[in-house]
């Protein structure tokens, strides 16, 4: 697998521990020359206690700091939104890889598919497609990685790196890569570290 350019047309919402930190994020971004995409404030259309602020990075990606009552505690990303040229094709792709990747699919609305894993979720919505993205999901076994690759390539999705160990990343790193319908690289990886054994 080769190096990729930076992602485009992506939305990432980062966890902020307080409303004050949301405000600090936005003010620092504006002072740093980032474009405003939504000043700090409540957004009750999302959730009653949702408070967020939005900036655009130099590539046009939407970057948000968000604080609300049901924030994830095990990571820095609250949510991710991908855009796709063909929502039905993306739904089929994630449906194919879901069993081996430990994911399940929820249709939240006709134009909104949510992919849910054990430690978070992301949304897929129609629009000019996200590009240049590499997204990896954890696997508990090398066999799950093999099955992920076999299922995806067997369904006609393009190989982006066959199952195998990649010691350049770290000892025990076992991953496989396929391309989603929009050409983004999706990986399943078993880190084979003591916690995984």
Language-model features: where?
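Long, continuous compositionally biased terminal/linker segments
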Residues: 1-3, 8-10, 113-155
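Intrinsic disorder/low-complexity detector
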Residues: 5, 73-75, 197
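Residues that flank catalytic or metal-binding motifs in active/ligand-binding sites
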Residues: 8-10, 51, 76, 131, ...
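Vicinal oxygen chelate
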Residues: 12-58, 85-88, 136-182
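A short acidic/small-residue loop/turn micro-motif
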Residues: 44, 68-71, 167-168, 191-195
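Short, contiguous alpha-helical
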Residues: 56-63, 179-195
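Surface-exposed beta-loop interaction hotspot
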Residues: 57, 66-85
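Core segments of cupin and vicinal oxygen chelate
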Residues: 81-121
């Amino acid at each position: 697998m080769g190096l990729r350019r930076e992602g485009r047309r992506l939305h990432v919402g980062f966890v902020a521990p307080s409303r004050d930190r949301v405000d600090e994020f936005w003010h620092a971004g504006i002072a740093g020359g980032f474009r405003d995409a939504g000043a700090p404030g409540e957004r009750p259309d999302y959730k009653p206690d949702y408070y967020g602020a939005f900036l655009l990075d130099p590539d046009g990606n939407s970057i948000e700091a968000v604080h609300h009552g049901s924030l994830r505690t095990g990571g820095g990303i609250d949510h991710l939104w991908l855009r796709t040229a063909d929502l039905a094709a993306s739904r089929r792709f994630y449906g194919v890889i879901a069993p081996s990747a430990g994911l399940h699919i929820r249709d939240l609305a006709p134009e909104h598919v949510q992919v849910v894993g054990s430690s978070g979720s992301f949304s897929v919505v129609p629009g000019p497609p996200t590009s240049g993205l590499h997204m990896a999901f954890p696997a508990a076994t090398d066999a799950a990685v093999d099955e992920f690759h076999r299922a995806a390539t067997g369904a006609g999705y393009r190989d982006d790196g066959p199952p195998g160990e990649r010691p350049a990343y770290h000892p025990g790193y076992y991953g496989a890569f396929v391309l989603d319908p929009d050409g983004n690289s999706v990986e399943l990886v078993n880190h084979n570290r003591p916690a995984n054994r």
